[in-house]
Amino acid sequence: MRIVLLGAPGAGKGTQAQFIMEKHGIPQISTGDMLRAAIKAGTELGLNAKAVMDAGQLVSDDIIIGLVKERIAQPDCANGFLLDGFPRTIPQAQAMKDAGVVVDFVLEFDVPDEEIVKRMSGRRVHSGSGRTYHVVFNPPKVEGKDDVTGEDLVIRADDEETTVRKRLDVYHQQTAPLIGFYGKEAEAGNTRYVKIDGTQPVDQVSKQLARILG
């Protein structure tokens, strides 16, 4: 079962990725983790990637595709894998297809921008422990204070509304076109494309995924 997850930051992909991994026993493949592992292992691709990164440049699609192919050939991917955060662009998706990487399911988590802004800009964190709250969905007992220590809660820079909106803009420019790409792939019978309403409660989304993935 080879799965690609699509959806804006804050759409709930991470939560459902955990559910899918546990239920189906397949690993989640993150390009960041792969890059770090390849650099640490000193593989040829890893050394190439390190040279590019040390020069302050972006790692090319060719190197990333090479890493993906290396990674999915490992024994723990025998029953499938879950790709999150890759491919991000149509050239990456095309290169993956050209490299013979088959995708069984593309799952798009659809959540309106304003809902994502509400979700992410409402997060509050206790710096000392990492405990996370939400002003709407999971408020602390005392506004702005950690339940355990009573210390102040902070907003992470990533969760500031302006940052969230910038990340959404990048997603719509770069990654949203993949929806069209994989839609066509599904029409051609090369994959199954499923759009999921990410505004549903978490357990409802998990149940829907269980029905889709079997």
Swiss-Prot record:
Q: What is this protein called?
A: Adenylate kinase
What is the recorded function of this protein according to its Swiss-Prot or TrEMBL entry? Catalyzes the reversible transfer of the terminal phosphate group between ATP and AMP. Plays an important role in cellular energy homeostasis and in adenine nucleotide metabolism.
First and last residue of the signal peptide:
none
Q: Where in the cell is it found?
A: Cytoplasm
Q: Which organism is it from?
A: Aeromonas salmonicida (strain A449)
Protein EC: 2.7.4.3
Q: Name one GO cellular component term.
A: cytoplasm
List positions binding ATP: 10-15, 123, 132-133, 200
Q: Which UniProt keywords apply?
A: ATP-binding, Cytoplasm, Kinase, Nucleotide biosynthesis, Nucleotide-binding, Transferase
The GO biological-process annotations, alphabetized, read as:
AMP salvage
Q: Where is this region: NMP?
A: 30-59
Q: Which residues form a coiled coil?
A: none
